[in-house]
Amino acid sequence: VVMSVLIVSCKGKTGNTITVGSDKLDNTQSYFSESMHTVARCDTGYYYLDKCSASDDNLMFYDDKSEESIVLCNKPQCGHDGEECMAYISGSEFKSELYYYNSYIYMISSKGNLVQISADGTQRTDLGSICVLSGQDSVSMCFNDGYAYVSQEITGDIEGNVTVRLYRFNLDTGSSNKIYEETGYGIGINSLKTYGSDTFFLKTSVSKDDKGLYSLEGKGIFRITGEDTECLLDKNVYSYCIDADNNKLYYSGLGDGTIYEYDLGSGKSESIYKSDNDTGYFYITFDGNYIWMDDEGYKNMAMYFNKQSSSLDYTLYQLDRDGKLAAKRTIPDEEKIFSIMHGDSRRMFMFSFVNNKIVYIDKSNIEKGDIKELR
């Protein structure tokens, strides 16, 4: 691993003007969240991970045309229930994130190597080491122009300090460069995504007050060009997405329940949506047609960290590009949603503990459509 580390601060910067360039969303797949990345879009359907045991999965393919799923295994008379199956993904050998880029499936091994899987699932190729991982490290990945960009969050020490790192991995040569590293209390790298020709990420930090209550603070949006990292926007941001074709960035302010539109060409910012309840922030994505939001992160912080809620009813929001509310739907607690994964223009994906399955709602009828298992 070649080291080339930059620690960049957003302090004092109100925003840079850039042109992102056109976007191919099915290539960058920035319409998925990074919280539980177990679904990936390809030209003809979806690849996804389906539980075959408490800790292991099978690699599946859902075909748009037939509207059916198959296990990616061509062994005759295979029961698809163990390590002899070609589709078997061991929870001890792989991280749980699944990606698709330029006709291949990608996963990260528990050791920190990047593994390339053929579209039919028959071949797995170890491309080399991204970094050294421990069992508790969390990772996220996106792709840009023949490179994988990978974030690593190393579990905090007894004082609560966390180390975050970013790597740039060459898919052709297998070389990995560390391009960013920082250590601090409760810090994190989030929303590592590619839009147009550039890759972006968000920095956050968690603090705890004298009463034991936790609060989250955004440290700015950063842009990666090659191995260079710079602050793009110094705002208290929880989540962002970019409409690359129109050079507009949308972000959720932390604590004010407001969605802002930031013009990447002029540097001008304006609010376009204000929450009608006490929701302090939203996770947002853009699927090429609409801005999609959820309050999962806010509700989880309120319940698990600050004990301010006894149930987890999540709400999905569909906004036009100008911020007009097109649709809204509350997912009740009894659906046992663990993660809202978002998705392409067709479907909103989630993971449900009801049957430990990936479920979805057709985006064409987000308000009243059935919640269906992906199968």
Task: Locate each region found by the language model.
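Repeated scaffold domains used in trafficking and secretory/extracellular systems
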Residues: 31-42, 81-99, 133-145, 184-196, ...
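A generic tandem-repeat structural signature
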Residues: 95-167
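C-terminal motif of bacterial Sec signal peptides marking the signal peptidase cleavage site
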Residues: 6-9
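Short loop/turn segments that connect beta-strands within the blades of beta-propeller domains
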Residues: 42, 55, 65, 101-102, ...
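Loop/turn-rich, solvent-exposed surfaces of beta-rich toroidal or solenoidal domains
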Residues: 280-314
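Residue position within the beta-strands of beta-propeller blades
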Residues: 47-49, 107, 149-152, 201-203, ...
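Sec-dependent N-terminal signal peptides
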Residues: 1-2
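Surface-exposed loop/turn elements that mediate protein-protein interactions on large endomembrane-trafficking
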Residues: 11-31, 57-82, 112-132, 159-183, ...
